[in-house]
């Protein structure tokens, strides 16, 4: 009887190892898929927070708090705003309300972002995520209109149209024209 029990014990161990091995394989596969999904989700949320101000997924994926998420979005908006102001040599230091309008313009521009985030894939010991962000080409798209506006504005300056304007009013008028075009 003892011999009979040993044979069944060996068979039982072999059969019990099969489900354990299968469980291990399935759990590792699920973990890998889960890790890949987390990386893809994180990248999507990072783009969405920077361009769209969508904080919910970013907070969940990164562990950041609402204040940090809002600050990240605002920093990106400030960067685009500053780039636009620098590109067009606009000085609005004395007109803070114009800064708000340029920030609103930056938010509007970024709201049109078009991007694609592919699934994450493992390459050796690292995960890679392919991201395609389609360019907005704001400056190229509006170049002819802005050039015509600047030429007209400069001709009006030469004609003395703005001689009675303060520097702040002059810069505000010029800035508003750019915002209307962009």
Residue ranges and their predicted role:
Residues 6-18:
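Bacterial N-terminal signal peptides that target proteins for export
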Residues 32-182:
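Subset-of-secretome marker
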Residues 27-30:
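C-terminal motif of bacterial Sec signal peptides marking the signal peptidase cleavage site
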